[in-house]
Amino acid sequence: TSKGAYYGYVGICEKLGISPHALSEYEKKKFGSFIGTYYGDTNGDKNFRKDELAAYYPVSDKISMKYQNESGKIVNGHVIADSSKYGISNKYLAFLEGDNAYTVITNKNIKDSSSCVVVKESFGNALVPYLTDHFSKIYVIDYRYWNGKLSHLVKDKKIQKIFFINNISMTRNSYLVGKLNQQIR
């Protein structure tokens, strides 16, 4: 989860020509045992060796996050939230407080107008916190729940970079492919 996302972040930084933070620069917090969605869906043996969910807090100390909740209200949130109180299969709520249709993250330590949009499903949640140290604004869209047009968002917010962070299984889901296709046209 977090460590795999870190390696994805390093790859993005290399492509952008920016220096990634070393993993040792981040404050690490463990939130207890975790099983992934796919394993949870199998109703498999719950006594196997479980993974432990760890999250790495952004280096920057002036990061704020707002997101659109299920009722459409914009609320304050945390890029990394304490998920220790959640069940073993819900620990992933530590990242961006879960799968929200639309999230805006602001880093007040960055004074330029750098911005990006991350189009993702839940697999992208763990990667976004690493990006927060490099952009003044990050717009996060979970295309499964968002109903806007990506081109309008990019134009209206003057977004400079677009990242698609998804797992491979979305490519076999015609509904999700169709929904994403509608948003990017």
Residue ranges and their predicted role:
Residues 1-185:
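Extracellular glycan-modifying ectodomains
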